[in-house]
């Protein structure tokens, strides 16, 4: 719990993700944990489950609940230093193996570093393709930046995408009125 995305009208797979969240209030994290437990029990999930939430007007909304793993599992496992696939396998196979469930041993713990998942897009290789994002996923992969600060983790993730970023020049930032609150940084040319 605690990754953070700000997306509108774009596929979640095309978004960046920061773990642990820098801005989600503790009360919302607690609500997300409660909802996830209730939904997992109701769906009788054994193993991994993919949940997507949104927070709007100080309220937590469930967007999706999928009783399956997502392609983000390896990245979250790496950031949290937890082998989630092994845990899920142990949970699913415990009746066959006779081993006790590892669930009771799971505890909340501090995430040892900051992780940023960034989508990789093919636009450098296909300049004729329109780079505008929409509801259909356009990314072709993901990378992970790990560091002890948010800025360094973001930098490492961007660097890993191998997208050529200019070091000088001007930037046009165009944001609709309804998305302006999602703009994290403003630019001021010096």
Give the predicted meaning of each segment.
Residues 3-4, 8-183:
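ATP-dependent carboxylate activation and anion-phosphoryl transfer catalytic cores
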Residues 188-190:
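A short, hydrophobic C-terminal helix/tail in secreted or cell-surface proteins
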């Amino acid at each position: 719990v605690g990754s953070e995305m700000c997306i509108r009208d774009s596929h979640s797979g095309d978004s960046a993700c920061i773990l642990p969240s820098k801005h989600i209030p503790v009360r919302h994290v607690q609500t997300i944990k409660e909802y996830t437990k209730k939904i997992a029990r109701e769906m009788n999930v054994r193993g991994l489950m993919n949940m997507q939430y949104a927070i709007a007007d100080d309220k937590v909304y469930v967007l999706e609940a999928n009783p399956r793993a997502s392609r983000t599992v390896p990245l979250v496992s790496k950031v949290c230093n937890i082998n989630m696939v092994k845990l899920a396998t142990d949970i699913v196979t415990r009746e066959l193996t006779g081993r006790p469930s590892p669930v009771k041993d799971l505890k909340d713990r501090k995430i040892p570093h900051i992780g940023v998942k960034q989508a990789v897009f093919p636009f450098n290789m296909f300049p004729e393709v329109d780079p505008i994002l929409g509801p259909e996923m356009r990314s072709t992969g993901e990378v992970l930046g790990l560091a002890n600060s948010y800025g360094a983790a973001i930098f490492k993730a961007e660097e890993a995408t191998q997208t050529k970023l200019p070091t000088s020049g001007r930037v046009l930032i165009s944001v609709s009125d309804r998305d302006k609150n999602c703009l994290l940084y403003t630019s001021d040319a010096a």
